[in-house]
Amino acid sequence: MDNFARFVDLVVNDVTYLMDRSLNELAQIHNIETEMESAQEWAAKSPQYRREQEGALRSLERYAPGRITLGRLTVNLLKLLTAETKTPFMVPEIVGKLAAMLDYNLGALAGPKCRNLKVRNPEKYKFDPRVLLSDIVQVFLNLSDEKNFVRAVAEDGRNYKKGLFEGTVEILRRRMITTENEIEKLLAFVCKVEALETILEEEGLGQAPEEFSGTPYFNARFVIPFLTDVVGTLDRDRGQGHDQVAFAFGPEGPV
């Protein structure tokens, strides 16, 4: 890697660490505040346990805002960098962990576990989930035309889920976080990921179409009609299954 690619690698590592740490601390704050909500149940805890939890909360109140702020700033830096240049993010040493980090954090902010980030006073901790979600989505959009990135997301079997992106779209629309053009671009990106994921599965089964032999990416002759079918599927499925996801930005989410 050249010097700038090394810098990009450090930025991705910093975002990964700071987001994981800050969201984990928000979840801890949520858990302690939830315990304290019932005065009767809290009073039933042992004095030592209450002291320990209250001390942990004071410590989190002291240190979490700084880490959350750093996390937000590094995500914003990532958004700005990916808007200006793509190539350094596409090197094999970076693109896979970048895709996994983005998928994971999208899940944390817009997936079922987002309710764990709901705290009594998010402003106190410098936590703005709308801004974080908007910036992470923008990174996806900035890289959405890069074949290496599409492939990296398609290969992220642990974190990538089509339903998560569909749920994110519902949040973006409901909260008017981004424009309809950007939402359509995000849905088109999901179509590309789904198409390539299917192709990769066929390759794994030895059933890849002949025109894909010897190439790691998709061929326009196959993908254009395939994406048309996928878009139709997305349109049909868009209203299904969302009631099973506790979206952030709803009554049970962090805002």
Language-model segments: residues:
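Extended alpha-helical scaffold domains
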Residues: M1-G214, F218, F222, A246
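Small Cys/His zinc-coordinating "RING-like" fingers
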Residues: S213-G253
